[in-house]
Every structure is written in C-alpha cells, then in structure tokens.
Regions:
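Short Gly/Pro-enriched turn/cap motifs at secondary-structure boundaries
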Residues: 19-22, 133-136, 157-159
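Short polar/acidic secondary-structure junctions
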Residues: 22, 35-36, 144, 158-160
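Glycine-rich phosphate-binding loop signature in dinucleotide/nucleotide-binding domains
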Residues: 36, 68-73, 146-151, 170-171, ...
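Active-site HxH/HxHxD metal-binding segment of metal-dependent hydrolases
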Residues: 48-144, 232-243
Length: 248
C-alpha cells in the first residue's frame, strides 16, 4: 500500500480478535522505494516466513509488493528494528532473492546471539525454532551512511522492548519507523528478557521530540498501525505518558 511518494506500508491484518485468530502474529513491514543507488529499495522489518497458524507471511508480502510494482530482487537493504522473529525471520530469504545486506544494531545482535540463543534452545524443546541473527551491517545512533542514497535516514537507539531496539527517522518525510517501541495507545512489552520499563519510557520521550507526521508502528495494536498527523501523534504520546507509563 502506497502511503506517499516512495513510502509503502504492508500492514499485517489482525485488528479484531477474529482476525488475530485467523491470521496469527506477524509485524507490519515498510518499504522506502528508490532510496538507494540504481533505484534499489530499503525494507524495514520483513516479518516472518510462515507464522504459528501457518499463514505464509513472506509470500503475502511479496504479492502485495508486486501489486505496487515492487520486485523483491530490487531490495537493496534489509533493516531490522529489533531481533524478535516476527520482525526478522524473512530477512535471510529476502537476502537470498536480492543479495541485499542485513542491518541491525550491534547491541541487539550480541544480545540475541548470547542470551537469546540460550532462550532459543529452551524453546526448541517445545518445537519452536528461533533463527540465528546474521548481520552484514551494524546500525549506530546517528545518520545512516547509505552512500549515493536519495533518502537520508537517521538511526535512533530506542531500547526498552529489547536491549538494542532502534527506530528509523526519515526527516524529509517526517516519518518514524518505530518497530515495537510505541503503538496506538500502548507501548512495546517490557516483561520479556531484555525488556526495561525505564528504558522504554526514556526512548519514547526521545522520539516524541521529533517532528513526526507518520508514526509507523510494528503492529496494528490499538488500530490503526499508522498514526498520521502531528497533532494525532502528539495526542498519542500524551495518552501513553498518562495512561500507560504508570503501569509499566
């Protein structure tokens, strides 16, 4: 789905309980088109390949991209906001189709390949497989060096939901790709390994200072998954401060 010029959103259905039961869990994926040299694209959080209810998430993503005239082999960079499988599992498959490098923060990669691997071994006993993280590039706080890129992106360290969670800010479009930092009326979970209530509050306050016209969240929690308009976004931050922060 095209939002504005060169910005596409692929929202995973799952607003109502019936939809969540039917479609299962997966993240929203976003694409910045024609943003790299030779007209290549950046995809943020490609999601899963197949989820817990056997929905073929990656196939669905590729079909929706094709409807917008976007070919998966024209992807030039894959960015993970964080290393939870519902956000990154499809990354290696897309890399195989496009030869695009995978980028994640170093803190997130190190956490998931140490503590995360211990957790993964425990989950494997229940038949749950957590793919390993293999990064080609590490994201650091500050402007992302994309060479001869058309889009200037800024990486923001936003820990709290996970230790190395990042958000991506596109100043030209005033768009924030927030991953699982903040949703419509809620925040990312902090009651999981690597989560921190203190850090997620600090991270939300950090991004709330930006000029944002498009808040692009990782899930449709609270609906909609995209909050548009500076005043609507400000109201959402205010709501989260008043009604969610005290209970984290």
């Amino acid at each position: 789905m095209k939002l504005v010029e060169n910005l596409y959103a692929y929202l995973w259905p799952g607003i109502t309980m019936a939809e969540m039961q039917r479609y299962g869990n997966n993240c929203n994926s976003y694409l910045i088109a024609n943003s790299l040299k030779e007209g290549k694209h950046i995809i943020i959080d490609p999601g899963q390949v197949v989820n817990e209810v056997e929905q073929r998430c990656l196939d669905r993503l590729i079909v929706e991209m094709n409807k917008d005239g976007i070919r998966v082999d024209d992807i030039g960079l894959i960015i993970y906001t964080h290393a939870h499988p519902d956000h990154y599992e499809a990354g290696p498959a897309i890399k195989g189709m496009s030869n695009a490098p995978i980028a994640i923060s170093k803190d997130e990669s190190e956490f998931m390949n140490t503590v995360g691997r211990q957790m993964a071994k425990q989950l494997e006993a229940f038949g749950i497989r957590i793919p390993e993280i293999a990064a080609d590039l590490y994201l650091e706080d500050g402007e992302l060096d994309l060479g001869e890129a058309k889009a200037i992106l800024r990486i923001l360290n936003t820990p709290g939901h996970s230790p190395g969670h990042v958000s991506i800010y596109w100043p030209d479009m005033k768009a924030l790709f927030g991953g699982d930092l903040v949703f419509n009326g809620s925040t990312g979970r902090v009651d999981i390994p690597g989560g921190s209530a203190r850090l997620i509050k600090e991270s939300i306050e950090k991004v709330s200072q930006l000029e944002i016209e498009y808040l692009l969240t990782g899930h449709q929690y609270g609906s909609p998954g995209i909050i548009q308009g500076r005043e609507n976004i400000k109201r959402n931050f205010d709501f989260v401060r008043r009604n969610v922060f005290p209970y984290l």
